[in-house]
From Swiss-Prot:
It is found in: Cytoplasm. Keywords: Cytoplasm, Initiation factor, Protein biosynthesis, RNA-binding, rRNA-binding. One of the essential components for the initiation of protein synthesis. Stabilizes the binding of IF-2 and IF-3 on the 30S subunit to which N-formylmethionyl-tRNA(fMet) subsequently binds. Helps modulate mRNA selection, yielding the 30S pre-initiation complex (PIC). Upon addition of the 50S ribosomal subunit IF-1, IF-2 and IF-3 are released leaving the mature 70S translation initiation complex. Belongs to the IF-1 family. Pfam families: eIF-1a (PF01176). It comes from the Bacteria. One of its GO terms (molecular function) is ribosome binding. Component of the 30S ribosomal translation pre-initiation complex which assembles on the 30S ribosome in the order IF-2 and IF-3, IF-1 and N-formylmethionyl-tRNA(fMet); mRNA recruitment can occur at any time during PIC assembly. InterPro entries: NA-bd_OB-fold, RNA-binding_domain_S1_IF1, TIF_IF1. The keyword Protein biosynthesis applies. This is Translation initiation factor IF-1 3. SUPFAM superfamilies: Nucleic acid-binding proteins (SSF50249). NCBIfam families: infA.
Amino acid sequence: MAKEELVEFGGRVSEVLPDSRFRVTLENGFEVWAYSSGRLKKNRIRILAGDRVTLEMSPYDLTKGRINYRHKV
């Protein structure tokens, strides 16, 4: 069985929440909950409010996502 296709969105972190979760405002104006990917946690990449990020989201639940890249300033 093939892995489901993920949808990528760009956005900006609007709030840092406990337990390495974030509230992200997407480029189209929607707000979603997001968490750091394992690669970001492993390499101890810090994500702060105001950072531009790229999210992966399931097409079945567009309210939650996984942050897989933090853009450079």
